[in-house]
């Protein structure tokens, strides 16, 4: 009886660890999608040149600091 309990306990523990890994992977992939979307919004505008460290926001057509723009939202 004790042997079966320990086997079931180990199995459940492994299952929980695997579920945790999967959920972390989904969060990371979701974060990557959001960052990629933000990066696609920050493309250079052909009619506007921005200084080093800045990029053109396609929607507002203004230069914004790249690091600030990615983390403001």
Curated annotation (Swiss-Prot):
Residues 1-25 form the signal peptide. Keywords: Cleavage on pair of basic residues, Disulfide bond, Ion channel impairing toxin, Potassium channel impairing toxin, Secreted, Signal, Toxin, Voltage-gated potassium channel impairing toxin. The lineage of its organism: Eukaryota, Metazoa, Ecdysozoa, Arthropoda, Myriapoda. Negative results: Does not affect sodium currents in rat DRG cells. Shows little or no effect against Kv1.1/KCNA1, Kv1.3/KCNA3, Kv1.4/KCNA4, Kv2.2/KCNB2, Kv3.1/KCNC1, Kv4.1/KCND1, Kv4.2/KCND2, or Kv4.3/KCND3 potassium channels. Exhibits highly specific blockage of Kv2.1/KCNB1 (IC(50)=41.7 nM) voltage-gated potassium channels. This blockage is not associated with a significant change in steady-state activation, suggesting that this toxin acts as a channel blocker rather than a gating-modifier. Shows potential analgesic activities in formalin-induced paw licking, thermal pain, and acetic acid-induced abdominal writhing mice models. GO terms for cellular component: extracellular region. Belongs to the scoloptoxin-04 family. It is found in: Secreted. GO terms for molecular function: potassium channel regulator activity; toxin activity. Disulfide bonds join 45-56, 50-63. Residues 26-37 form a propeptide. Its main location: secreted. Expressed by the venom gland. It comes from Scolopendra mutilans. This is Kappa-scoloptoxin SsmTx-I. It comes from the Eukaryota.
């Amino acid at each position: 009886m004790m042997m079966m309990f320990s086997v079931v306990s180990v199995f459940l523990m492994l299952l929980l660890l695997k579920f945790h890994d999967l959920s972390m992977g989904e969060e990371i992939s979701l974060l990557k999608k959001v960052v990629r979307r933000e990066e696609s919004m920050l493309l250079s505008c052909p009619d506007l040149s921005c200084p080093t460290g800045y990029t053109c926001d396609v929607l507002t057509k203004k230069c914004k600091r790249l690091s600030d723009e990615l983390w403001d939202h």
